[in-house]
Every structure is written in C-alpha cells, then in structure tokens.
C-alpha cells in the first residue's frame, strides 16, 4: 500500500513538472496573464502579466494518477479517489470560468461573489449525498477528533453543516493563494497527512490515499514554476480545485472537524479577512491589520515592524501547517483502534 502511495506521488510530480515545461510558454504565448489587484501591496504590480491558470499542470497530474495507480482501487470497487477528483474538478471548473472572465475583462474581476457561492453550494450538497450513497459519509453522526467520539446529528443539520464547512474551506484556501508558492506549500502537508492516515487505517482508504498523495506530488512539481519568483500562478482554476480537493478529503475520511487544526492557516487567513472588514465597517475606516488576509499583513511589516519576504511567509505557513498536521494525527490516531 505504501509503495502505491509513493508511486502516486512520483508520477504526479513527474507529470506536473513535464506539463509545466510546455504549459508555461503556451500561457505566455496566448497572453493569459494575471491582472493584479490595485489595492494590494504596490510591489505586487511587478507580477502583472505573469501567466495564470498554471493549476492545470497539477490537475492533469492528479487525473493521470487517479486513472493509473487508482485503477486497481476501481477493480476492487473503491471509487473514493474518483469522487474526490470529480468534486475538485467541479470547483476547478468554477475557477476556470472565473479566470476566463478576468482574462476577457483584463482586470481582476471575474464571476460575482453571489454566482460563485451558489455554484459552490450546489456542488457541496450534491457531493455529500453522492458520498452518502456510496458509504463514505454518514449523515446521522459526526466524528469529534481528539475526543475520539461520534455524536448523533440530524440529517438536515449535517447537510447544512457540510455545506457551510465546504464553502468556508473553499474560500479560506483560496485566500491563501496570494504569495508565490504559498497555497501549494501550505496544502502539501495537508495532503500528506491524509495519505499517511490512509496507510494507518488500511486498504479501505487506499483510493483516498492515492488521491491525496497525487495532489502532494503534483503540487511539488508545480512549485518548480510557482516558487518565488513565480513563472506562473495557479489561478482560480488551480486554487479552487485545491479547495475542493481538501474539503472532499476531509468529508471522504468522514472527519470534517479535523480541518479546525489541520487547516489552521486557512482559518487564520479567513478570520483575518473577516475581522478586517468587520472592524473597518464598525469603526468607519480603522483597521486591525495593515492589509488582509494575514499574509499581506506580514508583507506590509505588521506587528513585527519589518516587511516579511515572500519566502519567509511561505516557510512560516508551511511550518505551522506541518506542526498542526502532526497534532491532527495525534487527534485521530486511535479512531479505528490503532
């Protein structure tokens, strides 16, 4: 089983790296350049025109892994990786539409927030019922990490909870994609956590482990082109795909609450944005952070007095995520009597 996950990682890394070799020049040739927000850090304007939609390279890599290494899982009747892939692809498609609108308008304004939320909610509810149909999710109970207990919950309440968590996760992960290499470096430890858990819990979770390991490998290949200074951005095509993948894995393993610790940096990013907007409105113009989300606050020298380099921010986010992934591992270690 471990060898299959390693193989999934290696194949995804290789495919992502090779696809990127051809994709980046192609995106430059068709002028698929990113428009930078004018209200962002001023030095980010130097990134104007950097190719976007680079997430296509790790999306292709994960698809190859699911149809190659995941083939044995399908032969044994395990389709978890395909459900997660399909769900992530739906969100990737929403992101692609958003990127397309931005490129067409030549400004950083794609789909309206309302349209994106409605599409995300529809996808979330459909996914939950599909996973329930194939036995991956129980809509009448909720697992509590660290306490190692499952508490009863009504089906309507679970669906509302699931929709909230999925849409919240999607938009939190998306906020993290604001510095070269940040979203990919923060999400890799999350996916490695799910891959390791599948080894611990046995063959039942092999297909999900293949998917998680494939994402981690694909992201490493993507970082060849996305690490500072980035030659390409993943765009909403890639970031929303990742958002969907992380949310799908949490629910497919039937432990969505693990995202409270495992996704700590996503939560910090989202909370910083919510606090900033709320405080700004309540105080008629005052701010808690120099700029939100939190990674921009660090870039602007908030609290510390010196401006953080992009590589330092990436190291901080990835390091904290690794620590909380270990903590999360402790929180679910005994779930299946390990």
Spans of model-derived segments:
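Membrane interface segments of multi-pass transport proteins and intramembrane proteases
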Residues: 104-112, 144-153, 283
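Juxtamembrane helix-capping/reentrant segments at transmembrane boundaries
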Residues: 37-51, 106-119
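Membrane-interface loops
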Residues: 24-41
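Hydrophobic alpha-helical hairpins/lids featuring a short glycine-rich hinge
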Residues: 77-112, 116-117
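Internal, non-catalytic "lid/hinge" segments that mediate substrate recognition, gating
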Residues: 111-112, 119, 124-137
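Alpha-helical transmembrane segments
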Residues: 1-28, 58-93, 127-133, 140-142, ...
């Amino acid at each position: 089983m471990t060898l299959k996950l390693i193989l999934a990682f290696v194949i995804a890394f290789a495919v992502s790296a090779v696809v990127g070799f051809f994709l980046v020049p192609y995106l430059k040739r068709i002028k698929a350049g990113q428009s930078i927000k004018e209200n962002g850090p001023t030095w980010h304007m130097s990134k104007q025109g950097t190719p976007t939609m680079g997430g296509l390279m790790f999306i292709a890599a994960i698809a190859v892994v699911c149809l190659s290494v995941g083939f044995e899982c399908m032969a044994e009747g395990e389709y978890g990786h395909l459900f997660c892939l399909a769900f992530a692809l739906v969100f990737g498609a929403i992101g692609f539409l958003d990127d397309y609108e931005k490129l067409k308008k030549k400004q950083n304004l794609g789909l309206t927030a309302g349209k994106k939320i409605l599409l995300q909610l529809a996808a979330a509810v459909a996914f939950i019922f599909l996973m329930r149909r194939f036995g991956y999710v129980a809509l009448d109970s909720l697992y509590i990490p660290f306490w190692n207990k499952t508490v009863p919950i009504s089906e309507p309440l679970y669906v509302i909870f699931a929709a909230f968590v999925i849409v919240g996760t999607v938009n939190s992960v998306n906020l993290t994609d604001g510095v070269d290499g940040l979203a990919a470096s923060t999400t890799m430890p999350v996916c490695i956590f799910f891959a390791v858990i599948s080894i611990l819990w046995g063959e039942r979770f092999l297909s999900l482990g293949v998917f998680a390991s494939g994402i981690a490998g694909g992201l490493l290949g993507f970082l060849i082109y996305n690490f500072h200074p980035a030659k390409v951005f993943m765009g909403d095509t890639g970031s929303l795909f990742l958002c969907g993948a992380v949310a799908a894995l949490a629910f497919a393993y039937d432990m969505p609450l693990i995202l409270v610790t495992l996704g700590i940096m996503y939560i910090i990013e989202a909370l910083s944005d919510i606090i900033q907007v709320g405080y700004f409105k309540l105080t008629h113009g005052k701010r808690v952070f120099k700029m939100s989300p939190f990674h921009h606050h660090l870039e602007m020298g908030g609290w510390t007095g010196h401006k953080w380099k992009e590589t330092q921010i990436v190291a901080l986010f990835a390091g904290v995520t690794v620590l909380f992934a270990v903590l999360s591992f402790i929180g679910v270690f005994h779930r299946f009597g390990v």
